[in-house]
Curated annotation (Swiss-Prot):
Organism from which the protein derives: Pan troglodytes (Chimpanzee)
Protein name (Swiss-Prot/TrEMBL): Ecto-ADP-ribosyltransferase 4
Lipid bilayer topology: Lipid-anchor; GPI-anchor
Binding sites annotated in the UniProt record for NAD(+): 126, 206, 240
Compartments (UniProt record): Cell membrane
Length: 314
């Protein structure tokens, strides 16, 4: 399999003059940041913008599964008062957390087995605030690559652990109660064409909020629609009151099909395991001891390109 970058095809916009082209090379495959960019990108007045992105494994993303250390990490988060440290580092986050906490209390529901109030509030905190999505995704993509950098600069330790733990607990609960192992969900990007070849293996490298309703996913944009068969994601409707499934950053997917339509691309993905670079990072443990090995990726290039073409209106 050749380098992903060699597969990138330019998007040529109809124009009577040569387009102004800006080529951005992003090393380390920061796919979470690119997904964030897809949600923020807007054409400026007098120009048209198209972004073409090739998928990869998002290897630089912080993807800790806390395998074999979940209890110890929870204790350390409490003992080290990481909630206060994280909240103080983010503007307005304490108010947002309080709002999420109140929203959960007002629902008056019983917590699922083994879950705490903090798990519930973390889900609401993440799903109710678009600003949290942006900041969290950016941080996961860039500021947690070494234990030292993680400790010093990653101010989402509390949220990352409780979201990861919540997904894992809810998935177990769903299997025990309903026998449901996997879900077909949908996700749509804005102003971005994602490209992948049938048979390729990719992952998103971020917490992805997807919809169980295809019609609802269509509100997200009109460029690339993902139909995803996830087996590691978990439904969060009990908390958010929306038919949502949260997909963890470490889930791997195989591209089953890709088709082109007038309004964009349609990718069908099927879960094929999990992959983590980091594990028990808060405890300064070696990630090499706990890396799952469903897929060998040494031969793949981790270079992702974004090609932006801007056309001036005549």
């Amino acid at each position: 399999m050749g380098p992903l970058i060699n597969r990138c095809k330019k998007i040529l916009l109809p124009t009577t003059v040569p387009p102004a082209t800006m080529r951005i090379w992003l090393l380390g495959g920061p796919l979470p940041f690119l997904l964030l960019l897809s949600g923020l990108q807007r054409p400026t007045e007098g120009s048209e913008v198209a972004i073409k992105i090739d998928f990869d494994f998002a290897p630089g993303s912080f993807d800790d599964q806390y395998q074999g250390c979940s209890k110890q990490v929870m204790e350390k988060l409490t003992q080290g008062d990481y909630f206060t440290k994280d909240i103080e580092a983010q503007k307005n986050y304490f108010r947002m957390w309080q709002k999420a906490h109140l929203a959960w209390l007002n629902q008056g529901k019983v917590l699922p087995q083994n879950m705490t109030t903090t798990h519930a509030v973390a889900i609401l905190f993440y799903t109710l605030n678009s600003n949290v999505h942006s900041d969290f995704t950016r941080a996961m993509a860039s500021v947690a690559r070494t234990p030292q950098q993680y400790e010093r600069s990653f101010h989402f330790k509390y949220l990352h652990y409780y979201l990861t733990s919540a997904i894992q607990l809810l998935r177990k609960d769903s299997i025990m109660e309903n026998g449901t192992l996997c879900y077909e969900v949908h996700y749509r990007t804005k102003d971005v064409h994602f490209n992948a070849y049938t048979g390729a293996t990719i992952r998103f490298g971020q917490f992805l909020s997807t919809s169980l309703l295809k019609e609802e996913a269509q509100e997200f944009g009109n460029q690339t629609l993902f139909t995803i068969f996830t087996c590691l994601g978990a439904p969060v409707q009990y908390f958010s009151l929306k038919k949502e499934v949260l997909i963890p950053p470490y889930e791997l997917f195989k591209v089953i099909n890709m088709s082109y339509h007038p309004r964009g691309n349609w990718l069908q993905l099927r879960s094929t395991g999990n992959l983590s670079t980091y594990n028990c990072q808060l405890l300064k443990a070696s990630s090499k001891k706990c890396i799952p090995d469903p897929i060998a990726i040494a031969s793949l290039s981790f270079l992702t390109s974004v090609i932006i073409f801007s056309k001036s209106r005549v």
